[in-house]
């Protein structure tokens, strides 16, 4: 897709200069008032930085960041470039966004923390980088899952075990009432024992046992029933 399909002519000129590596021209146009932090008026409300990311031109992306493109600036859908590139097949992009001031706790358009994308793809470099840069492992998504609970929901138990070692709270319950103990117990009852995730699920369960969690855990239905009675669980 061409830039002029999304952005006004002055912005397109800046993007063209950036793609040529012409920092002088791009900077002059920006100093004259061209703003890189705008959204296309049509859904999904793309930004110039997002457009450059989609070209996969890392030199151009780096120059745009240097010239003031904000990795935290939200698209029309609510996400931003940090959440967009976390877990992608292009590992340099996340580091570039964070180095330019990107928020490691950015949310996607569906209100998922950026680290969830990295967990979903088991992109270890991105997971570790986000944690190194201050990602909150207990930030929750819409259904109330933190990083460890989300990882368990999608059977990424090696990642879950690592997250638990780095501060993820194993007590958090999703809005439906499920906690990590319930999810891992359910996973172990269904998972093929030859799965590479099976021994990691066992490690997660043992971690919970060592923390004093009793098995079998309460089911989500039992938890919701207690919640309905005003009881603390």
For each feature predicted by the language model, list its residue ranges.
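Ankyrin-repeat-protein effector appendages
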Residues: 1-13, 133, 166, 175-233
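Eukaryotic tandem repeat interaction scaffolds
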Residues: 87, 103-153
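A generic tandem-repeat structural signature
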Residues: 69-117
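Ankyrin-repeat boundary/"N-cap" motif
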Residues: 6-16, 39-50, 74-82, 107-115, ...
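Ankyrin repeat structural motif
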Residues: 22-30, 57-65, 90-99, 123-132, ...
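Ankyrin repeat A-helix N-terminal signature
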Residues: 16-21, 50-57, 84-90, 117-123, ...
């Amino acid at each position: 897709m061409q830039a002029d399909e999304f952005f006004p002519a002055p912005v397109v000129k800046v993007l063209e200069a950036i793609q040529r590596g012409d920092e002088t021209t791009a900077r002059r146009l920006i100093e004259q008032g061209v703003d890189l932090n705008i959204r296309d008026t049509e859904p999904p409300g793309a930004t110039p930085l997002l457009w450059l990311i989609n070209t996969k031109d890392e030199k151009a992306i780096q120059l745009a960041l240097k010239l003031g493109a904000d990795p935290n600036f939200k698209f029309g859908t609510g996400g931003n470039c940090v959440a967009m590139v976390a877990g992608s097949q292009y590992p340099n992009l996340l580091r570039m966004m964070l180095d330019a001031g990107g928020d490691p706790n950015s949310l996607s358009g569906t209100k998922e923390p950026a680290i969830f994308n990295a967990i979903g793809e088991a992109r270890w470099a991105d997971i570790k980088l986000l944690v190194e840069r201050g990602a909150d492992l207990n930030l929750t998504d819409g259904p109330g899952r933190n990083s460890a609970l989300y990882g368990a929901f999608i059977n990424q138990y090696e990642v879950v075990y690592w997250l638990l070692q780095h501060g993820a709270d194993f007590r958090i319950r999703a809005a439906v009432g499920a906690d990590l103990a319930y999810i891992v117990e359910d996973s172990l009852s269904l998972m093929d024992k030859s799965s590479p995730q099976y021994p990691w699920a066992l490690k997660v369960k043992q971690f919970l046992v060592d923390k004093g969690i009793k098995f079998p855990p309460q089911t989500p239905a039992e938890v919701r029933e207690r919640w309905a009675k005003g009881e603390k669980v």
